[in-house]
């Protein structure tokens, strides 16, 4: 459906961003969220949930490469990976590029998101849903990590912001469950918002994660759609060395994996753990 309307994001009060809507691709209120997918001339197809942009075709690769390749290459030998959320399929797509991984489980609370995105954002999953290693579980993420008997080497929480259905994925109950089902030397990562505008989210996540993990920090990337500066990703493990790998080790692992990335490289990996002083100060308070 062609349209000349403007779509305004409602994440922050007093300022924000807008998108021209060239064509509505899909719009529906699911059991959990109000979902819309539309065409924008600059960014391609855009998906928004509850008034907040989740992903665009133009810049999604930055987010998904950093959420996957940083923990997977830092670990070095992951066999079992858990994705919480990620219904658009792009996180799965990037994880599937690691051929040594044996099992990939994705837990998505909203089956509708998976269905919509497979049809209307096919470039995001790029066929990854058909990978033989993949298993989809429709469940609440908190419930899954606290009930499953499976163990994982890396857990990637591709959560929305801590409002609505995504709120539970920022709780101590969720973090404790993730710690419970991680193997030794396992790594947990999660999106944690744009820290200049959502600093409290980072501080709260750091405080809660520190109850369950010995080494908690953040790494970062600048993603145009998530305006306001750098986006921070929570990092939690019990092995500090995994966050401090030397360039030679990362370069060797990157080469062995045979990855051809558009944003990620070993130098970006190393530099992403350098955080601005205002965030370091907030975390130290």
Curated annotation (Swiss-Prot):
Reactions this protein catalyses: S-adenosyl 3-(methylsulfanyl)propylamine + putrescine = S-methyl-5'-thioadenosine + spermidine + H(+)
Annotated active site: 158 (proton acceptor)
Single biological process term from Gene Ontology: spermidine biosynthetic process
E.C. number(s) listed in UniProt: 2.5.1.16
Gene3D superfamilies: Spermidine synthase, tetramerisation domain, Vaccinia Virus protein VP39
Keyword Cytoplasm: yes
Keywords: Cytoplasm, Polyamine biosynthesis, Spermidine biosynthesis, Transferase
UniProt-listed NCBIfam families: MFS_SpdSyn, PRK00811.1, speE
Quaternary assembly: Homodimer or homotetramer.
Record family assignment: Belongs to the spermidine/spermine synthase family.
Protein name, as recorded: Polyamine aminopropyltransferase
